[in-house]
């Protein structure tokens, strides 16, 4: 540019591309070049620079003010939040199964896991349409059963999980029911079964043996069942299909995506049980109560509730009513009431439930509100030269209370696990979750597990964190898969966040898996826009992590620069709150990569036209300005 005056404008325009980088050193060099050789009258240069205003640092904008159009956004003290769509809408209604043809088509897809709700939708559809199938349709089940056998014998696709194995086993039981009901038309199904049993017997004594001859979803075992809730729902469906009486609907079948139930539909289903004086299945009822959309404000709801009687009416009036509506007896089914109380307000202990056996258990197992902490410890290994090599590790853990029904086995060891059982013969749905940490490769099942209790996912998220998100260095396929599944589920869920949800969100901003970090940023962006997230709470958790070196701070600063800064004036205000809360909790001894965090903070103060005012942050800044590499960043904050 110095030598070729005729190309200065072109060179400045080309150099402007470097403003995509948020690095201060890079932008300052480009600013110097443009100020030296750029013409303020150049419309081409102005147009090019306008493209990069979103990635320009505040100081860069100030230096290049003469080259920029005056289009600064208005700074407003009040912000408009994006509207939160209601859960129950016409555009997210799950299409009903209205014929036997629809039923068979759905069954052909259920093992593909195309939709999260297909598993439950098939169960509800079978109960409704099974008896209406014609004999000529039975042969259409053969390819469906072929896929079920293949999944059980060879493991299925990379999208299949343990729940799909349970569904495949259930389909085998259903095929036996069809063979019994249509002996001639189902001959093809019977031949398929005999062929697969014969093939399986050749594997006897080997790893791939499945014992198809005796395999049933009702199999009794002394081993812990991996996913007992879904197994109970499958068994309940089979009971209804085998019953000679007109089957009643499953209560837990979702009506709206991803997996919600409209309150009006649940009331209509319960009316059918009420009219026939039939007892709902306990786990089916608990799951239905867990999935009901609590925000529904239908004007018809009070009228519909009056169509129920006794315990049904009192139960749903309590669950769907305002927060101050208290439970009214009779309490003939404690599991229903306890589950309704947890869905409505997990932090509230209702005195009306004081005699329930569930209260004997540590309440943390019901709410997921375990105390957590990060700490450092020294680990070591012996290398090839028989020399002991030590290093400092950081880990995230929960304090698990021990009692008569909860024990920590192999405490503080690599194979630590929790043993827990319910005091009640009807365990709560959330009491099933502690078993999950024992099993590998559950990422394909996690979304469906989370949607068992969409109004209170924290009891599940605790075990996801314990299972795969406890160490910031973990980036193996299993851990990354579980982390991604957990944070993606958090993105879809619509519950009110409690501590563990905030812990998962903040922790995923520091994990090794880049995809999970990106998800965490997207969740923050979306919830800030809707006004339903506490950024300061996230900052406090992040500072706690940094106290013990849990996760490199660079992962967070890179994430902020790439996705979280300059989304909107509102987001910049919230990001400032997050960083202030984080700085407040940091030690006086500078943590690694603190310089970049301070530079981002200085940038936000400039953008937001605000000043550092927190007394503890000001105290820390005074301490840090004596550190050579932090001096300039601190000066930019204090000016």
Predicted regions and their residues:
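Alpha-helical structural signal with a strong bias for long, charge-/Ser/Thr/Gly-rich
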Residues: 1-13, 26-31, 37-639
């Amino acid at each position: 540019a110095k030598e070729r005056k005729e190309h200065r404008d072109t060179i400045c325009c080309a150099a402007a591309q470097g403003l995509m980088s948020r690095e201060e050193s890079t932008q300052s060099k480009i600013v110097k070049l443009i100020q030296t050789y750029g013409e303020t009258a150049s419309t081409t240069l102005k147009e090019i620079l306008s493209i990069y205003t979103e990635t320009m640092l505040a100081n860069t904008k100030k230096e290049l003010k003469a080259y920029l159009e005056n289009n600064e956004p208005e700074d407003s003290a009040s912000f408009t939040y994006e509207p939160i769509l209601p859960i129950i809408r016409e555009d997210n209604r799950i299409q009903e199964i209205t014929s036997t043809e629809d039923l068979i088509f759905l069954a052909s897809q259920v093992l593909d896991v195309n939709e999260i709700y297909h598993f439950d939708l098939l169960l509800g559809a079978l109960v409704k349409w099974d008896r209406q199938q014609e004999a000529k349709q039975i042969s259409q089940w053969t390819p469906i059963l072929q896929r079920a056998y293949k999944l059980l014998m060879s493991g299925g696709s990379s999208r299949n999980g343990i729940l799909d194995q349970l569904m495949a086993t259930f389909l085998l039981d259903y095929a036996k029911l069809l063979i019994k009901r249509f002996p001639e038309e189902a001959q093809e199904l019977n031949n398929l079964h005999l062929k697969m049993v014969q093939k399986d017997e050749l594997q006897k004594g080997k790893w791939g043996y499945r014992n198809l001859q005796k395999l049933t979803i009702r199999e009794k075992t002394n081993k812990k069942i991996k996913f007992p809730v879904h197994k109970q729902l499958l068994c309940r469906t089979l009971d209804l299909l085998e019953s000679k009486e007109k089957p009643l609907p499953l209560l837990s079948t979702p009506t709206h995506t991803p997996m919600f139930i409209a309150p009006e539909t649940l009331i209509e289903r319960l009316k059918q049980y009420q009219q026939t004086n039939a007892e709902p299945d306990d786990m089916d009822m608990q799951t239905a109560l867990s999935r009901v959309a609590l925000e529904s404000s239908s004007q018809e709801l009070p009228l519909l509730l009056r169509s129920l009687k006794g315990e049904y009416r009192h139960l749903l009036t309590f669950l769907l009513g305002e927060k101050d509506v208290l439970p009214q007896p009779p309490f003939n089914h404690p599991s229903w009431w306890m589950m309704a109380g947890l869905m409505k307000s997990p932090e509230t202990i209702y005195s009306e439930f004081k005699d329930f056996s569930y209260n004997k258990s540590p309440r943390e197992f019901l709410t997921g509100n375990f105390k957590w902490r990060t700490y450092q410890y020294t680990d070591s290994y012996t290398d090839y030269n028989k020399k002991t090599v030590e290093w400092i590790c950081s880990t995230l853990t929960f304090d698990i209370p021990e009692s008569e029904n909860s024990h920590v086995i192999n405490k503080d060891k690599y194979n630590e696990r929790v043993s827990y059982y319910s005091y009640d013969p009807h365990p709560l749905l959330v009491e099933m979750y502690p078993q999950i940490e024992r099993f590998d490769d559950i990422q394909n099942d996690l979304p469906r597990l989370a949607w068992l209790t969409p109004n209170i996912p924290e009891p599940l998220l605790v075990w996801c964190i314990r299972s795969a998100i406890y160490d910031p260095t973990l980036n193996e396929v299993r851990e990354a898969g579980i982390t991604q599944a957990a944070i993606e589920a958090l993105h879809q869920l619509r519950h009110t966040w409690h501590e563990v949800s905030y812990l998962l969100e903040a922790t995923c901003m520091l994990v090794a898996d880049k995809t999970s970090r990106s998800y965490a940023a997207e969740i923050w962006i979306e919830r800030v826009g809707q006004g339903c997230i506490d950024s300061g709470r996230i900052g406090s958790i992040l500072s706690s992590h940094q106290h013990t070196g849990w996760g490199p701070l660079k992962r967070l600063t890179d994430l902020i620069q790439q996705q979280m800064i300059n989304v909107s004036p509102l987001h910049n205000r919230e990001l400032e709150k997050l960083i202030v809360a984080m700085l407040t909790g940091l030690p006086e001894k500078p943590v690694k990569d603190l310089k970049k965090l301070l530079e981002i903070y200085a940038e936000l103060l400039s953008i937001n036209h605000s000043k550092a005012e927190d007394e503890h942050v000001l105290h820390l800044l005074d301490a840090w300005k004596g550190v050579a590499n932090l001096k300039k960043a601190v000066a930019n904050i204090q000016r």
